[in-house]
Amino acid sequence: MKKIITALFLSVGLVSFGQVTTNPDTVCINAVGEQYFVTNTPGSSYSWVTTGTLASGQGTNAITIDWGGTAGLYPNAVSVTETTVSGCPGNPVNLDVYIMDLVLLGTGTYCITDPTFTLFANEVGGTFSGNGVVGNDFDPSLAGTGTHVITYSLSGCSQTMNIIVDNIPV
């Protein structure tokens, strides 16, 4: 669950909110059930606006969003406005969202005698794992013959690809 930090200040009956502490939020492409919340003020209601699909929670201090299948940075993708029990609305608090789509290069069929090669992902800083993987490199002879599932993980997102290693013809 992701918390949007807000600060409440009363000034002549008006409510305003502080800044969000983590911005932008990073989610995986097609993420389902991402939760966002602000500190609950008894008696207040909350109006949420999002570029994702609001799955549940409108009117409360906590919502669930399903994100779509188009990667990119979405400014003000989550916005919440608190209205006090006396009907005074605060200023909206906005959160940018980066929808991450991991694209991997290196899939294909290789011979067991082929040299070690470097695996690539469109987003840097993640970790490759699987048979034959050493750091960011794939070694066909270390992996052995067969189909190998290689996984790349970054910021809670992961993507897989298949690499096939064949014996050399006799």
Model-assigned labels for residue ranges:
Residues S16-V170:
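Proline- and Ser/Thr-rich low-complexity, intrinsically disordered segments
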Residues M1-T21:
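Bacterial Sec-dependent N-terminal signal peptides
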